[in-house]
């Protein structure tokens, strides 16, 4: 019995997901399988490729022939190089960065909220700002005048 390692398609029309399966070569694409040895999700970034290396090595060892797409996946994971005894058995599989948990994001947003805004949220109108600046300057001038008068009175006594 000729055995092939091939992809079994799952998912919707434009979002394919595949199972890496071992099946009789004569069965149809989504037909009965002997064993499911992995998954492949090409729409993720980077693509998700999870293949049970031990089972893949076993099936390759007993003569199962991988199809071309599965052969490419086995080369990426390094299982084909390990089977053939070639260098580069660690593979070239890219690993996605772990997403920050929602709890971490919430705690970070809470810490930023407690610190308060670094700049004012609203800007005052120019006319109002000029009036306040003039009033502030007048108050400073009065304070300076009072400060000058107070030492003069003390010196006179």
Curated annotation (Swiss-Prot):
GO terms for molecular function: structural constituent of ribosome. It comes from the Bacteria. Residues 114-157 are annotated as: Disordered. Keywords: Ribonucleoprotein, Ribosomal protein. The keyword Ribonucleoprotein applies. GO terms for biological process: translation. InterPro entries: Ribosomal_bS16, Ribosomal_bS16_dom_sf. One of its GO terms (cellular component) is small ribosomal subunit. Belongs to the bacterial ribosomal protein bS16 family. PANTHER family: 30S RIBOSOMAL PROTEIN S16 (PTHR12919), SMALL RIBOSOMAL SUBUNIT PROTEIN BS16M (PTHR12919:SF20). This is Small ribosomal subunit protein bS16. It comes from Corynebacterium diphtheriae (strain ATCC 700971 / NCTC 13129 / Biotype gravis). The gene is rpsP.
